[in-house]
Amino acid sequence: MTLAIGGHVQRARVCGFIVLFTAAVTFSAHAWSAPCVSPISSCTEWLTVPGTPGRLLLYRTYPLDTKNELVTSALVVIHGASRNADNYYRSALAAGFLADALDTTVIIAPRFAAGKARSDEGQECADKLAADELSWFCGGKENWKNGGAAGFAPGLTSFDVVEQIVRSLARREVFPNLRSIVIAGHSAGGQFAVRYAMANRVQDRVSVAMSYVVANPSSYTYLDVLRPTHAAMISRYPTLAPGYQRVPEPSQKPFVEFENAKACPGYDKWPYGLEERVGYSANVSNADLKRQLVARPVTYLLGELDILPLYGFDSTCSAMAQGPTRLARGVAYTKYVTEVLGAQHRQVIVPACPHSARCMLTSDVSLPVLFPKQ
């Protein structure tokens, strides 16, 4: 076990496990405390959006209202359907340690809590809420992962909340040396990330570079009636689409107008497509959604082994129209946005990773995407 005396965060590996702890260090009046590296109450704060009711809990390594000249980047990590922001915070901390970026990165993990469950949702969709805590439904179009409105604050969406986080980070009087903000999400958080990338209007209003990391979502948002064929899912990865590995006809196009629209009328409705949008995106035009998605830097992190219909896998006909597995859907969507829409998005297949946020976030191939070099 070796301690680096000069570092704020002391690091060690014990029996193969990553250990993070802070040493007792005396700081000058112009120095900054060590990052908070545990999902405990002292590492949390409540976020409010001016002019709106309610508040949202978030975990963070540094306070968002205390001047910090050490921080040069920010990582906002969005949890999955289980709303376990504390576990996602742990995974992001592990990734920050492996990237040697904990001291200079403010890591934030917001919690989009679930309030009273709808009649078609189980009790696992009802969290214990603090006073005035914002909450959302788990399912349906009007939920947090699609930019839906909060339960008792219909004018406030989950996308508005992350916009407020971005605005807080972009304040030069607090983070004068911040140069990049990464919005990353896994599973349901990946759905949030890709839809937030195309819809948000804050990116063009701040002076900090923003990028997006979309990891293993169960569905994407297509901007027209095209859907992938087998030709869009050809890959050197044999696990891509089990049962769908036949070689396509030479003349088969990778994307065609969806042929089963009559039997699957919801295939092009929000959040799978642009029809009948609700929440934040309802106030953004189709043209702006396309323009922003194409123009913004997005990386798709896809687990090589995320091929099983588990962990909330969306098996509706609208989702199945996008591919048979999460991996296949991600490969096809990357091809769609780059070849059909003309975006310059990237795709990274994460070796040996199934549907696991910890595996995805801490992989060697993921770290440069989550913690880009300045």
Question: Where are the model-predicted features located?
Answer:
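A domain-start/cap signature at the N-terminus of enzymes
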Residues: A31-A74, S82, D86-V106, F137-P154, ...
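Cap/lid segment of the alpha/beta-hydrolase catalytic domain
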Residues: F112-L156
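Conserved acidic catalytic loop of the alpha/beta-hydrolase fold
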Residues: D160-L178
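Conserved strand-to-loop "acid loop" that flanks and positions the catalytic carboxylate
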Residues: T299-G323
